[in-house]
């Protein structure tokens, strides 16, 4: 994804993200992320960890794009759904599909649709 972006808007977005919890979603599933961080503004790069024990771990390894959904402090129920071992998490939350067929959760603080830049296999 090579769309132009506003660095100041991206910086403001990261600055207002206080909960530290978000949900990564694909076309068919997702999981709770509590390690999401901005790595670079130019180029825009983000970083997060996926545990190998995560239900959707293998499917995320083969993705070209996905979404990060920023949760509000009152959305613990959504965080818990995506932290579970349930194999049909998306059916339990309101969402829509983007033009790239990526599920985006409704009523969150916001979302980013991202493409994979690099994957590093380190540990569990």
PLM ranges: what are they?
Residues 1-124:
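Active-site-proximal mixed secondary-structure blocks
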